[in-house]
């Protein structure tokens, strides 16, 4: 009899433990990943900005659409690297993307449309490796070489 109660409580506990709803940053990541899986994408794209920016007060359920900008990186989509570890490609393609969001059974359904925005000026943030190299350059010792000499002929 006791084992029946334990089994019943375990089943009810499993039913009540539903997965957490999808967050806004997770929806942005999934949207960029789905764009990178398109066959025409040569180099992977990375999130450049989002409107609104991800933050504590932004909830996916209150948004009707995702609006974000992505930029081409130096990595290929087939590389198994996280896109955040890839540096932006110099003079890479920039795309403005938007699309309505509907959440069905904790899975976002996004009809994504992207347009070329490469002509718009943008400040490019380097990846982790680029930031590491910049820090090394900042702290390296300054070396000055001075060459002095004289020559006498005959």
Swiss-Prot record:
One of the Pfam families matching this protein, by short name: Cathelicidins
Subcellular location: Secreted
Disulfide bond listed as a keyword: yes
Name the record gives this protein: Cathelicidin-2
Entry GO terms, CC: extracellular space
Gene (name only): CATHL2
Record-level GO BP terms: antibacterial innate immune response; antimicrobial humoral immune response mediated by antimicrobial peptide; defense response to Gram-negative bacterium; defense response to Gram-positive bacterium; innate immune response; macrophage activation
One Gene Ontology term of the molecular function aspect: lipopolysaccharide binding
InterPro entries linked to this entry: Cathelicidin-like, Cystatin_sf
Annotated propeptide span(s): 18-122
Cystine residue pairs: 75-86, 97-114
